[in-house]
Amino acid sequence: MLSALATSAVPGFQAVSAQSLSTPERDAALVHDVNSFAWLVELARTEPEEALMSARHSAARALSEGLRSRLSFRVPKLHGTTDVGGKTLSVSEYLPGRELVPARVTPILAASVGKALAEIHQLPTSTLLDFDRPSQSALDSLREAAGIVDRAAATGLLPQSLLRRWETACEDAGLWQFETTVIHGLMQASRFLCDGEQVVAIEEWRELRIGDPARDLAWLTTPTMSSFSPAVITSYRSSRSSADRYVAQRARFWAELDIARWLLHGIDNGIEKVIEDATDMVQALHDRVSGDLDQALTMPISTNKHPLAT
């Protein structure tokens, strides 16, 4: 059915085979055309999924040919859409490769990941502004982080030493002196599609925007990535000479604040299981970083005037 509907989205489209990739949230199929080219045809089943797909389509349109030409890997490319019962059916290029598995990352693959991240962060920001993608300054990033810390502190569930660690990071003006870049915005291991030891595609760009490049590195600072993250960061820095001095420290900070966000999500929505899970994660983080200078976010604290100081 999806392959037949695809002809309305892409005139002249001729499917010869289709493989279902459907989930409870969406109908989807991997479709091959008469030229043996692979396409992804999707149709949301739920309103939340429709909203997600709309965000993906918007980001895909912002990934212009000019931006794509600067990347050594493939990204989603939307070829057509059509309305089906009030929802949007889309036809896009099927991205090749297999999802990155952290336990199987070799030094060569780690270098490829670092290079891919650097390429994203070196894209010109002007194109995203032309497409009205969100833009967050360094000061905006600091204010967001400080807001999360303040809200988490108000729960009374943070160990005092962990709270002070986060407050110190917010108070360090040097940590927040960086140039914003194009960022993926939802980066994690599963976004990378690989062929052998090379990154061949990156998916899920719905949060594409201008912001702190450290956000795209946060996933690397979690314990499960420790076996290869140093190699990724080394490759990233060698591929992007303009990377700021404290990008790795901010990446660690954003990863820690993700735990605070999880805690706040549970509290805001009254989900006890989430609150319990997040509280355990907070304690585990506290135990891991307490007294370990290798885990420091800022050392020493900058003496520069704080950006929010009046």
Task: Give residue spans per PLM region.
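ATP-binding glycine-rich phosphate-binding loop
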Residues: S8-N35
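Active-site acidic catalytic loop and adjacent metal/ATP-binding pocket
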Residues: P24-V34, L40-V41, C170-R215
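Regulatory N- and C-terminal appendages and interdomain linkers associated
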Residues: M1-V10, V289-T310
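A conserved long alpha-helix in the C-terminal portion of kinase-like catalytic domains
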Residues: T224-V289
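Active-site Asp-x-Gly
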Residues: D195-D244
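Conserved short submotifs of the Hanks-type protein kinase catalytic core
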Residues: G85-R98
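A conserved alpha-helical element in kinase catalytic cores
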Residues: L2-S8, E42-G86, V101-K115, E119
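A cross-family kinase active-site recognition segment
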Residues: R74-K77, T81, E99-G156, T180, ...
